Amino acid sequence: MKPTKRIKVKNGIEYWYEETPYYDKEKKQIRHKSKYLGRNVDGQPVKMRSAPDEIKERAKPKSASVKSSYDYGSILILQSVMEELKLDHYLESQLPSSEASLVRALAFNRIIRPTAMKNVGSWFEGTALALESPQINLASQRISEFLCKLGESNIPDRFTSQLIEGTGTANTLIYDITSLSSYSKLIGLLEYGYNRDGADLPQINLSLIMDKDRGIPVMYDIFPGSIPDVSTLSGTLKKIKAHGIQNYIAIMDRGFFSLSNLCELAHNGISFIMAAKLQLNDLKHLLTEAQKDIDDAKYLHKFNKDPIFAKPITYKIDTSVVQGYAYYDPKLEQIEKQTLLTKLYDIREELVKVRLKKNSNPYVVFKDKVQGFGNYFDWKVTDDHFDVSIKQNAVAQRMNKMGKYILFYSGNFDAIECLSLYRERDEIERSFKSLKNEIDILPLNAHSEKTTRGFIFIAFLSLIIRTRLITMMRAAGLLDKYSVELLLLQLEKLRKITLADGQMLVTEMTKKQREILQALNLCA
């Protein structure tokens, strides 16, 4: 590793140092040896003790005014993630250099300081990106035009193919879908459907595929808002095949469960793990039969230090037989019971307090208060108030199912391995949360379908970088001290400054900044 020279400013005086990186085998991280070279005199290091008097005179402190200051630290770390995953290479192979830089700027903005597109230019001017790519135009109109161009092109698909090939994605894929709402009336994909956030707005459905082993999203797709999860699987399987991925395990929640999807997965020889949706009568019967002896000690296992029962089952579909496990989790059962009973108690108390007005509709008031739990109550109106009782049979039937669920699978999985892989879906749930909160994708404010597609590609790229950074932070033991946001705030204080005389300096690192970069094996 080559040494680098840098200027450190102490008490307003500039000093030259030579820093040589080396690998510390004991701490398993990159560290630096620092060697003093001398005072900065006209851009050169000078040892003052042996310097002539005229040099000492010239070296007396002068007020060097700072012309500009730029965020360098947070840009450095995100750029290092891009380079590690070769994302910059994939972009530059698909786009002219200026447009690849524009994509990078937009993606970094969603991670560091998500803001309206009209404000991105102001943010960009305060970052080190402005020094590297001063030529890019970040006017609001230019961004909209570029996102539209990106959205109508096949660049996102080509980028995805390169990403999948470059990461060697082939093993375990986690598939899920979420809703993205919008106020716009100009996006053709927007339709009303089941909204996972409870928003009464038209929406787009966004599917995401995560590479479990790399911990990053590798593929996404967009569907009209009215298309249910279960109907998206067939097209997604074809896309996965088109990208050359074979011999993988697909992990899906109950939203994708249907007999046709089970048959298609089996017909294509795809290994999968999928939660069952217990609405079909034969599946209800299957669980009822399984739970008769599911708490037998021979089915007892331990998962995450807690006892759990898992009983092998089979399910016949036409001429095919699907393997599965029926699970009984006593801890989950208790949590679900307490949650339901607390909810029913609170609703009952709220209803008892209600005093009905003369012109009010009791049924409407009741439905508003019970929030979807109406089937658990008997009620009538007496004078101006509700007489309410909880239906014991309804509660007992619901409690009988608590803590119990079925996972179907194809492949060679034991009960705990099957459950462990299914629980990895938490990663994709966190990714959706990042998209909607940290990356600030909602509500969609684009004014056309093409622009929306372009913006979602930017958000997808941001999510790749952010999830990879989280994986790096976890491996380095930094997640106990920092969130992504706090880590980037610490590194924002590492600045590049330009002086009035044209010099460019990097400010001295704080102890926390040095610890972060060393833990991540990065050099400033």
Each model region followed by its residue ranges:
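Active-site beta-loop-alpha junctions of metal-dependent nucleic acid enzymes
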Residues: 221-243
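Dynamic "connector" segments at or just before major functional cores
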Residues: 1-189, 206-219, 226, 234, ...
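An anionic, glycine-rich sequence signature occurring as long contiguous blocks
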Residues: 202, 222, 269-421, 475, ...
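Conserved structural-core and active-site-/substrate-pathway-adjacent residues in large, well-folded domains
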Residues: 18, 120, 174-176, 215, ...
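Short amphipathic alpha-helical "interface-anchor" segments enriched in bulky aromatics
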Residues: 418-445
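Secondary-structure transition/capping motifs at alpha-helix termini
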Residues: 25, 127-135, 153, 166-169, ...
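Acidic, metal-coordinating catalytic cores used for nucleic-acid/nucleotide bond scission
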Residues: 251-260, 278-281, 450-452
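Basic, amphipathic alpha-helical segments enriched in Lys/Arg and hydrophobic/aromatic residues
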Residues: 448-470
